[in-house]
From Swiss-Prot:
It holds the Pfam family Trm112p. Belongs to the UPF0434 family. It comes from Legionella pneumophila (strain Lens). One of its GO terms (cellular component) is cytosol. Transmembrane segments: none annotated. This is UPF0434 protein lpl1884. It comes from the Bacteria.
Amino acid sequence: MDKKLLEILVCPLCKGKLLFKKHELICKFDRLAFPVRDDIPVMLEQEARLIPLEEKDKL
């Protein structure tokens, strides 16, 4: 993932900062992980994975 792109991308729901981990962009506040496919972030809520509380604590 391009570092410059990561600096300008925000969560589409809360506009918070995202973390890049293992082909996903993660919003800790909303507990959502947005997939990155072929280096293209998919920033759609319906495509995001809900992060379980146990996993959120490890981020």
